[in-house]
């Protein structure tokens, strides 16, 4: 779908879900259907609850991320749906703060030449990670990853509509104009 046109319309059961440039649907999907339709592997989706006391979003009872003050409006909800693109889940390093590391057990791994895709289970959901390059990762290994709040798409769990788009997307576009080097 990303290469089929300048603008696309995504339908689900005959109902228009979103119209726009493919990259806009990819970066700012209006709902989880659009999020999981566009992209390979698709966006990871999971249920989340909010802790109003600690001002954290808790994904799958395991991943706890602090909510920045500018996003405190999210605390008005009890539960949300979160999404993150596989390429936005990062590898933890020795410099990564211990509280930011999330240890996951590898369920499957594919080294595809210029990238490595592996999966892990977060509650009942299988999530995918896509890293550039060739990584020596074995099925059954436990590895540390990092999920940043800024990388999340957050959807209202009742309306399924996007209420927070990712804010850390790398964009290499200059005013929709051709770049001459």
Short names for language-model regions:
Residues 22-39, 86-98:
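Short boundary/loop segments of OB/S1/cold-shock single-stranded nucleic-acid-binding domains
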Residues 11, 16-21, 28:
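ABC ATPase "signature
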Residues 4, 12, 84:
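A cytosolic small-molecule/anion-sensing beta-strand core signal
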Residues 2-5, 37:
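Hydrophobic Walker B segment
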Residues 3, 19, 116:
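Ser/Thr-centric signal marking residues that sit
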Residues 43-45, 52-181:
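Non-catalytic connector elements of ABC transporters
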